[in-house]
C-alpha cells in the first residue's frame, strides 16, 4: 500500500493544475482502496466553509457549488478535530448532514481524513462505501 500511495503522490505532484491533481487523487484513491467514493473538500478559512472540489462517485451538480460550513456535518467535525473519523454507518452519527444535490444517501461507510500542511488545515479527504464497514 505504501508503494501505491507514493505512486499517487507522484502523479498528483506532476499535475499542472490543482483541479487535475485533485481528480487524479480521488480516482486513484478509489482504485487503491477499492471503494466507490472519494471526495476532496477544500477549506476556505475566510468564508469558514468547505468546497467540494473533486469527487469520484458522488454527483457534483453542474453550475452549482457544494459547500459545508466549518461546523456542519462529519466533514466539519473532521476539520474541527483535525483527526480521522472512521464510521461503519455515517448516517447514524449525530453530526451527519445530508446534502441532496450530491446523491450520497446510499453511502453508509465513511472515512474522513484531514488534509494538513505545516499545521494548517487545507481540507478534508473523504472515502465512502454503500456497505456498512469500517475502513482499515
Residue ranges and their predicted role:
Residues 1-20, 31, 122:
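Signal-transmission linkers at sensory-effector interfaces
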Residues 14-53, 62, 72:
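Helix-loop-beta substructure at the N-terminus of cytosolic sensory domains
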Residues 62, 128-136:
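Regulatory loop-to-helix N-cap segments in sensory/regulatory domains
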Residues 101-107:
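Short loop/turn motifs at secondary-structure junctions and domain boundaries
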